[in-house]
């Protein structure tokens, strides 16, 4: 009964529970496999993959903030060829029943399509998370990220959906005037779901050098500080679309995960909490039945349907 009440069914994903380590906070799984059995997880969102290898931004690339952190990693990854030849086969060999969500990044719709097509052929990749918080090299769009321009977002998502053999979930940036417009563009382009939110943009300064702490100047802010923002934006989007949402942004406890459900999420991504506590995900999973009992929640699916009805 405990297992059934935690199960989640989404396009392409039948999960034993809703807890998913967020992309960029869990590597390709090997880093955390020494701490616990990854089969405990609902799924894994692996690190972003681009067509070619990327070495990322210069250091320092990480800085602490009150109730969170800043990062400017720069999409460091070994590239599609290595991910297909080494990273995904390791996961399939060690965890053959664990569904993988592949995070895909790029700088043109052609690159998004190529990576989506290639990575979706891996048998353990059951869905793609499309990271559209990247600059675009095809258009002179004055420094806008792809996810800040609904028309660009539509083109990129459509290209990825047409190229992919698995459902595509689109990761939305909160750095927009109207996130609903971008969400609707993704839906119109054929997305099967959404993940949100990506990091906010912030910076810190070193009083001694009088310069930004991050070599890149700015970085993505994550952690508990962004949690209320994530809840608000998830609720805003959930009121306007029937696409399932994998909610993320500052989740560090079982209670926070259930709050995401109340906002309109259908599954939960856990990011920065993995850095402060490598057991964050299994801890949340273990506590779910107890906390659900405390608040009279019989199953996550019933809670999801209850929230969905209230949003209409």
From Swiss-Prot:
Pathway: Pyrimidine metabolism; UMP biosynthesis via de novo pathway; orotate from (S)-dihydroorotate (NAD(+) route): step 1/1. Binds 1 FMN per subunit. It is an enzyme of class 1 (oxidoreductase). Its cofactor is FMN. One of its GO terms (molecular function) is dihydroorotate dehydrogenase activity. It comes from the Bacteria. It is found in: Cytoplasm. Its EC number is 1.3.1.14. Coiled coil: none annotated. It catalyses: (S)-dihydroorotate + NAD(+) = orotate + NADH + H(+). Keywords: Cytoplasm, Flavoprotein, FMN, NAD, Oxidoreductase, Pyrimidine biosynthesis. Substrate binds at residues 47, 71-75, 131, 198-199. One of its GO terms (biological process) is 'de novo' pyrimidine nucleobase biosynthetic process. SUPFAM superfamilies: FMN-linked oxidoreductases (SSF51395). Its main location: cytoplasm. FMN binds at residues 23, 47-48, 103, 131, 171, 197, 223, 249-250, 271-272. The active site is at 134 (nucleophile). Pfam families: DHO_dh (PF01180). InterPro entries: Aldolase_TIM, DHO_dehydrogenase, DHOD_1B, Dihydroorotate_DH_1, Dihydroorotate_DH_1_2, Dihydroorotate_DH_cat, Dihydroorotate_DH_CS, Dihydroorotate_DH_I. Belongs to the dihydroorotate dehydrogenase family. Type 1 subfamily. Heterotetramer of 2 PyrK and 2 PyrD type B subunits. Catalyzes the conversion of dihydroorotate to orotate with NAD(+) as electron acceptor. This is Dihydroorotate dehydrogenase B (NAD(+)), catalytic subunit. It comes from Streptococcus pneumoniae (strain ATCC BAA-255 / R6). The lineage of its organism: Bacteria, Bacillati, Bacillota, Bacilli, Lactobacillales.
């Amino acid at each position: 009964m405990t297992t059934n009440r935690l199960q989640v069914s989404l396009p392409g994903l039948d999960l034993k529970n809703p807890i998913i380590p967020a992309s960029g906070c869990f590597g390709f799984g090997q880093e955390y496999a020494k701490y616990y059995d990854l089969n405990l997880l609902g799924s894994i969102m692996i690190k972003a993959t681009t067509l070619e290898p990327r070495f990322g931004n210069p250091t320092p690339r990480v800085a602490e903030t009150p109730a969170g952190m800043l990062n400017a990693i720069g999409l460091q990854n070994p590239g599609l060829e290595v991910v297909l030849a080494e990273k995904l086969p390791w996961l399939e060999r060690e965890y053959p029943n664990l569904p993988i969500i592949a995070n895909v990044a790029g700088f043109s719709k052609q690159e998004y399509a190529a990576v989506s097509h290639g990575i979706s052929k891996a048998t353990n990749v059951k869905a793609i998370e499309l990271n559209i918080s990247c600059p675009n090299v095809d258009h002179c769009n004055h420094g806008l990220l792809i996810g800040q321009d609904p028309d660009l977002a539509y083109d990129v998502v459509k290209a990825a959906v047409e190229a992919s053999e698995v459902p595509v979930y689109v990761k939305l940036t909160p750095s927009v005037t109207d996130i609903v417009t971008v969400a609707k563009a993704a839906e119109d382009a054929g997305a099967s779901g959404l993940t949100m939110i990506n990091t906010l943009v912030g910076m810190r300064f070193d009083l001694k050098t009088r310069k930004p702490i991050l070599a890149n100047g700015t970085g993505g802010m994550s952690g508990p500080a962004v949690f209320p923002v994530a809840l608000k934006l998830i609720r805003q989007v959930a009121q306007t679309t029937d696409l399932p949402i994998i909610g993320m942004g500052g989740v560090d406890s079982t209670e926070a995960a259930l709050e995401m459900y109340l906002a309109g999420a259908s599954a939960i991504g856990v990011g920065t909490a993995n850095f402060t506590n490598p057991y964050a995900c299994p801890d949340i999973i273990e506590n779910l039945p107890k906390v659900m009992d405390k608040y009279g929640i019989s199953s996550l699916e019933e809670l999801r349907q209850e929230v969905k009805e209230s949003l209409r």
